[in-house]
């Protein structure tokens, strides 16, 4: 048979070589292969082979147990014990798996993470300022008290408040006052800046209270740190010398390096963009519309606060100091003084320093006294959906006037009771659209009277519920809506229009206004138009900048200033001796004056002026009676007089005008407040011996003495050559002094101003140091020093990628495997105990971090941290730590890190491995640019947690970009 098949096979082979194979033989081969493949799939031989490869010991024991069961079948009842154990192990392994974790076994440790509810700030809050409802749909979001005044119900200890106030005061003293005091001494702008800083700090404190700090640390910040450690480990594998570790790590990051680390200028630009991105959430509503304010705050925060703070945190010396504090097992220092009382957050810091009345700050009483303002205020309340708040005040006032009568009839009590029921249904019921939020006891008292018999309404005469409700609503109007109205479009329309008020008669029958006719804003347009009109002076074209109050398209020819001792008198006959010291000067009142220089007859401007009463008594010796007259001078004419007297006679220390008001209205009220100061100035001038025969001063005090001579003009872009040639012939010096200084100052004033950039941008980071001193230093140099056109990826950053490790237990295993290189048996043991102890360890870690944070936020420690931050930002002139001190601190840090590892772990991994691993971590923390990289990554995570709205904005921007 074998030979036969062998013989049959020969011709088959020869036939195959000839290309004529048997179809039956081919079909049989394919059928056998199919059957074997199906049998292999059913038996899962590949899976069995892989299991044997992964678990050789377990498979060997299972094989031995199977062989023993076959050979020793008489003792099968004994072998069932081992089979039960194997079945239990397999069952638990298949049912639980690595993702199945045992709950926390430490029942005494309980940590409750914070529940993230509604955001108190932007875009919705937990309580409406008017009705108190959650997610109020009737009133605008800007009416939320937490949005407009986030410091409400926010209290801190007085010592912490004082420390924060000190830091903010230093911010103003170092970055605002050095240049602001050169402009004006008015504190109005600084007061607004104080409120803005208080708003910013309050928003941060509220948002920090809302986030779960331990969860952020364990779930996000530590994960970013693990990725940073991985980069350092990979970089260390490429280089052996520590000096090249930082550069190797930066190359390992590649395009995933944080954008702020590309260069120091990119870092500053990133901080600027970050602050601008946060402005809608950290500044008061509508504050971002003010370009100058946002630009100033951006430069202060980015260049003078955040940049030095991040440099301080990334400094290896600072990192070593923080590590020593964290590793130190000594008990924390206890407070030596009792806790200070709680005070409203930064209330003392935000108190206004400006004592002068501001046109942008009105009282509710002022609004109610003027019908035009009250009308504007009601329109504003209608726009805000809160006109019923004012209506409640008016209704309660009328109700109180009626109920406080001594004797009330039954009809009057019945009418009052019906009115009270309307008040209750309109303003107290939850279903009412005009509901106002009151304390519960107020609503209960009003409800009890409203639902009781009508004769009980007289009890309201002695009850405090209605009075407290009125005080609450009045406070709401004064503290919330009135400031909002002063910054609203309605009020600005009122200022631009100029309110006509009742007039009064003066001694010269000139009408005035009660509050001042105009605030000067309505004339800005005409002054800008005047720039493009010109007049000639000695062949030079001069733009006509009308600065005087009330000018409208005013054009005048060049004025020749004459100051000499010639006996020219505007009031009396010539050649009469003049002694200004004998003149009596007073400014009894401020009046209004129609500008005769206006070209448009139909548009006469009424300008507030000082009325100067002059009594001349220096000609009695020649038989003349005392002469009386009045002169009307504008506010700016006084400063022109002072400037010209200074040019001819020098300064007079005992006769000085107050600081000139450049920005802001110079209206009737303002001039009235300056009346006594200007009167004293003139009285002191006429008493100076060298001015006793001054023609300039006499012209100023004479009704016809140079009406346009004292109108201040700004004259840029003039022909200096022609002016210099004409000055000696037109100027006659008084007593021959001060001509040369006058000519020099005149030439300087005529020089053309330098062109201004179209969009000015601050470049000086701090007025106390040069720009490059903070931007470039020896520690950070130029960061990674990468070009702007370096390849960048579209994803957010290197650290937001999904990682397989999650939680403190996984982080410890990761560090042990990557850094400490633990043996396989220990790694498998840790993986086995992960199911039992992962949740327990993470719960204990959260509890431990929460306890540490509570200790850190104790009063004395918080004050100490704020002091350290203050010293890091503002103590620029203090000597830095010496290199020897820094090396000593680094050595101490390394020793503490070596001692921190338990001896049991050292026995498992070995002493040499311990040293190499700790050295790797320590060397990674001594690289300033790498520390800065980690700092910015952690900063981004913290910002996204504090301001989750940024994630929505970014998603919308990303979707919009992808759609386009």
Swiss-Prot record:
MF (Gene Ontology): phosphatidylinositol-3,5-bisphosphate binding
- Tissue expression: Expressed at high levels in the brain, testes, and lung and is present in diverse brain regions. Increases significantly during neuron development and maturation.
| Limits of the PXA domain | 157-331
Domain of life per record:
Eukaryota
Which cellular compartments is it found in? Lysosome membrane; Late endosome membrane; Cell projection, Dendrite
Example GO biological process: protein transport
Q: Which residues form the RGS domain?
A: 363-495
**Entry GO CC:** cytosol; dendrite; late endosome; late endosome membrane; lysosomal membrane; lysosome; postsynapse; synapse
For the PX domain, which residue ranges apply? 588-708
Q: Which InterPro entries match?
A: Phox_assoc (IPR003114), PX_dom (IPR001683), PX_dom_sf (IPR036871), RGS (IPR016137), RGS_sf (IPR036305), RGS_subdomain_2 (IPR044926), SNX14_PX (IPR037436), SNX14_RGS (IPR037892)
Principal place of residence: membrane
Q: Where is this region: Disordered?
A: 1-23
The portions of this protein that span the membrane are 51-71, 76-96
Membrane disposition: Multi-pass membrane protein
Gene3D superfamilies the UniProt entry points to? Phox-like domain, Regulator of G-protein Signalling 4, domain 2
Keywords, comma-separated and alphabetical: Cell projection, Endosome, Lysosome, Membrane, Phosphoprotein, Protein transport, Transmembrane, Transmembrane helix, Transport
Regarding protein family, the annotation reads:
Belongs to the sorting nexin family.
Miscellaneous remark of the record: The SNX14 locus is maternally imprinted.
Name the UniProt record assigns to this protein: Sorting nexin-14
Which organism was this protein described from?
A: Mus musculus (Mouse)
- The gene behind this protein is Snx14
